[in-house]
Amino acid sequence: MKLDLNKAKKRVDYLDKLRIQRALSDTPESFQQVFKLIPLLLHFNHPDLPGYVPGAPTSIANFHPNKFQQEYLSNILATENIKNFLKKHRTFKSEAILGVYVMGSIASIAQTPQSDLDIWLCHQENLSLSARELLQQKTECIQQWAKRFNVEINFYLMDQKRFRCFRYAAPINSENCGSAQYMLLLDEFYRSVIRLAGKPL
């Protein structure tokens, strides 16, 4: 049974990779860059990187920058050795973000070059209110950065407990106006979700 479960997890990971490839095909290069950098900008909080907010919680569980993300860091942090930077930030005291997921029309036949990105960010249950507010500010900064490339991002912050109990998770853009709409969002989430980084669902 355990072996079958491991195989199933690998198949889901493979399917996510295929769906990401499909999502990025026939999209502008600027969209692709923003899409690929979202996990990186959430994982690190550096003054030279977009989305920097002093004191904001950082680190995504099990996240390791890929080649594209490392090259981006090398270009941005030109005066800093990238290997030393990654080594210094390899171990965080705690991983504030458990997972980052994209949902909605992405990678579906409904996707268009104008499609926005609905990003669900699952954070630690014990994150303080002040830390959550700083994390929200960080996502808002990333939203503003993405708009420079004509990419719209909607972030939804939630913790494990609220998600499991189907309780309200407030989106930053305030489009979610009640628990009924949230349940519809939750249904859409499970039907269309792709894991970008962090722990599997």
Where are the regions that the model predicts?
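Active-site pocket-lining segments that scaffold enzyme catalytic pockets across diverse folds
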Residues: 116
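Catalytic core of pol beta-like nucleotidyltransferases
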Residues: 1-101, 107-113, 124-201
